[in-house]
Amino acid sequence: MQAACGLAQLERAQEFIDTRKRNFKLLKDRLASLSEFLEIAEATPNSDPSWFGFPVTVKESSGVKRVDLLKFLDQNRIGTRLLFAGNLIRQPYFQDVEYRVVGELTNTDRTMNQTFWLGVYPGLGQDHFDFVGDKLEEFFGLNF
């Protein structure tokens, strides 16, 4: 039964991929006004991702704590997720494990502490992304 459902979904795979790409672009365009406060992910050169989520990093210069922003979004019924694990060597599992580190891991720590993602699944559309944009502008004092 699960295999049959999976095969049926495969027939719609390209539709899902195209919709995720469209949704990523819609949300990216809608959040352009917040570039002073937020860093938005970009596809790397020569890539064509099917975005599972919309990564957002709160800039240190914004003066905002990610937790405060996430609480605000949650209070406004906007779902978010943290990225898996962040800096793995800061996880309890690594407390008694020998490992070596090359460099400072500043990007990894920044991702762990300041990044979250919003959904871009195919069931969302322009109205949803406008709502998210309006609420983020409100949070950062841009929505007058």
Give residue ranges: language-model regions.
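PLP-dependent aminotransferase class I/II
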Residues: M1-F144
